[in-house]
């Protein structure tokens, strides 16, 4: 069957278009309002307090413990796991530190072999984690 033709077909064409719109991924994303239910609630970054440092086991076939931090977001109190990049950067993070969290790759999906981790740590106590790692800056005494 093709689309309806004729002078009286406008209502049918319009309603069909309206129902078919929901098959479009980007339309659905912008109109369902699910963006506000996610931890970041529509923003690109969020600040949080480190609750604990955790090690998450990598998925098969890899064998490693990926260093992460359990963080409670300040804006809404949600608890998330955030990956700590670079070798030894977990040493710059203490419990109760304020950290800046960003998304981690694949538009809300976990990246690579780290199951369930969708965010990464960018700053610790207002200082870039990369700057701390390269020893260009020091973490402020709190």
Curated annotation (Swiss-Prot):
Which UniProt keywords are given for this protein, alphabetically ordered? Hydroxylation, Ribonucleoprotein, Ribosomal protein
The source's domain of life comes to Eukaryota
GO cellular component labels = small ribosomal subunit
Bias (Basic and acidic residues) occurs at: 21-30
Tell me one GO molecular function of this protein: structural constituent of ribosome
Return the annotated region ranges for Disordered: 1-30
Q: Which cysteines are joined by disulfide bonds?
A: none
Modified positions (Hydroxyproline) in chain numbering: 61
| Biased composition annotated in UniProt, kind: Basic residues | 11-20
Which InterPro entries does the record associate with it? NA-bd_OB-fold (IPR012340), Ribosomal_uS12 (IPR006032), Ribosomal_uS12_euk/arc (IPR005680)
**What processes does the entry annotate via GO biological process terms?**
translation
Database matches in NCBIfam families: uS12_E_A (TIGR00982)
Which family does the record claim for this protein? Belongs to the universal ribosomal protein uS12 family.
Provide the protein name: Small ribosomal subunit protein uS12
Originating species: Euphorbia esula (Leafy spurge)
């Amino acid at each position: 069957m093709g689309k309806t033709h004729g002078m009286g077909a406008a209502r049918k064409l319009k309603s069909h278009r309206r129902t078919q719109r929901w098959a479009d991924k980007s339309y659905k994303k912008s109109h369902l309002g699910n963006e506000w239910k996610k931890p970041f609630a529509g923003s690109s970054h969020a600040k949080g307090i480190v609750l604990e440092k955790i090690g998450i086991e990598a998925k098969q076939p890899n064998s490693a413990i990926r260093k992460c931090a359990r963080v409670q977001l300040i804006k809404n109190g949600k608890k998330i796991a955030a990956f700590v990049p670079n070798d030894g950067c977990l040493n710059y993070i203490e419990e109760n530190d304020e950290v800046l969290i960003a998304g981690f790759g694949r538009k809300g999906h976990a990246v690579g072999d780290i199951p369930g981790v969708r965010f990464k740590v960018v700053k610790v106590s207002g200082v870039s984690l990369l700057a701390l790692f390269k020893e260009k800056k020091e973490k402020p005494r709190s």
